[in-house]
Amino acid sequence: MSDIERLEQEIFLALEAACDEQELEAVRVAALGKKGSISERLKALGNISADERLKVGPALNELKKRILELLAQKRDIFKRQATALRLSKERVDVTLPVRSSPVERGRIHPISQVIDELIAIYADMGFSIAEGPDIETDYYNFTALNFPEGHPAREMHDTFFFSEDATGNRKVLRTHTSPVQIRVMEKKQAPIRIIIPGKTYRMDSDATHSPMFHQVEGLVIDKTSNIAHMMWLHETFCKAFFEVPSVKMRFRPSFFPFTEPSMEVDIQCDRSGSEVKFGEGHDWLEILGCGMVHPQVLKNVGFDPDEYQGFAWGMGIDRIAMLKYGMPDLRAFFDADLRWLDHYGFRCFDISTLFSRLGNV
């Protein structure tokens, strides 16, 4: 056994026998300190022949490297052991005592509640949920939906545009959830039955409008769906959502670039008192816009308008939440006021279903 091998064995046995940081440091100093066994041998390399130096030097450096690695491993073990010991001795119970009568404090935001109600109603009628990006291209937000160049919706004062990219194109914050209709029709074959709840953005702000608001749109595409089906769908939805046995509706001619014919739908109500009552009275409130999908929109996504048809509609989630639950100012929805949420919010464990009151408060 050479001198270096014997030295290696001694040092490694000492390292293995070290029981704490103090003993480990003593081994380090004895081996690698200023007057340590390895340090002294490295200093003495100049006193031996060149041939021996070529053998002994690398061997000593390799031994020094292995010792440092083992030292680091042992230190890590000691640190983890010390931490575990300290935690076992210094354990603190950070939990609060349970209230004698637990009180529900959290509340579901009215927007989240209404979205759940919408999903429950439309899912019961066979619709699935679709989603898409908030940041859209001009094509999906306008062109594919039959918005011509120069349409007012393309103006800067109505739409949030991003800066132009290297190709001169600008993306937008979507002004409606209609782009998702295009994306779904590009990927799926008929029949299609979807609703698309989500955030939309327009330059508008007052008591009944917000620059960011929530909208739900729906789309039905097949070979036979017609206006009669669309009218039945809206009537069924309004009865379920506003929780009334019957409701009168009127369909007024309107214009949307992506539907033809287009209509706006009003619902019968009574606004004579402090709150709006649906299914009775002599007043009318606009509730949504709808129409048969424009043939050009079908062509844009590869559907043959001579074979396929369908209808689409959209309504403001914030608006119908205000109408149903009597909230006067849309801006309060987004003020993060816990007092407002405590008043208008919903209990966390109330689940929207068609077998109980949807808006159980």
UniProtKB/Swiss-Prot annotation:
The note describing how and how many cofactors are bound reads: Binds 2 magnesium ions per tetramer.
- Keyword match Cytoplasm: yes
What's in the GO CC field? Answer: cytoplasm
- InterPro entries for this protein: aa-tRNA-synth_II, aa-tRNA-synth_II/BPL/LPL, Phe-tRNA-synth_IIc_asu, Phe-tRNA_ligase_II_N, Phe_tRNA_ligase_alpha1_bac, Phenylalanyl-tRNA_Synthase, tRNA-bd_arm
Q: Where does Mg(2+) bind?
A: 260
Q: What is its main location?
A: cytoplasm
- Name the cofactor(s) required for activity, per the record: Mg(2+)
Matching Pfam families, A to Z? Phe_tRNA-synt_N, tRNA-synt_2d
Subcellular location(s): the record lists:
Cytoplasm
Intrachain S-S bonds? none
Q: Say which enzyme class the record assigns.
A: ligase
Listed under GO biological process in this entry are: phenylalanyl-tRNA aminoacylation
Reaction catalysed? tRNA(Phe) + L-phenylalanine + ATP = L-phenylalanyl-tRNA(Phe) + AMP + diphosphate + H(+)
Q: Sorted alphabetically, which keywords does the UniProt record give?
A: Aminoacyl-tRNA synthetase, ATP-binding, Cytoplasm, Ligase, Magnesium, Metal-binding, Nucleotide-binding, Protein biosynthesis
- EC no. given is 6.1.1.20
Q: Which GO terms describe its molecular function?
A: ATP binding; magnesium ion binding; phenylalanine-tRNA ligase activity; tRNA binding
- Name the source's superkingdom: Bacteria
| Quaternary structure note | Tetramer of two alpha and two beta subunits.
Q: Which protein family is it in? A: Belongs to the class-II aminoacyl-tRNA synthetase family. Phe-tRNA synthetase alpha subunit type 1 subfamily.
**Name listed for the protein in its UniProt record:** Phenylalanine--tRNA ligase alpha subunit
Gene name tied to this protein: pheS
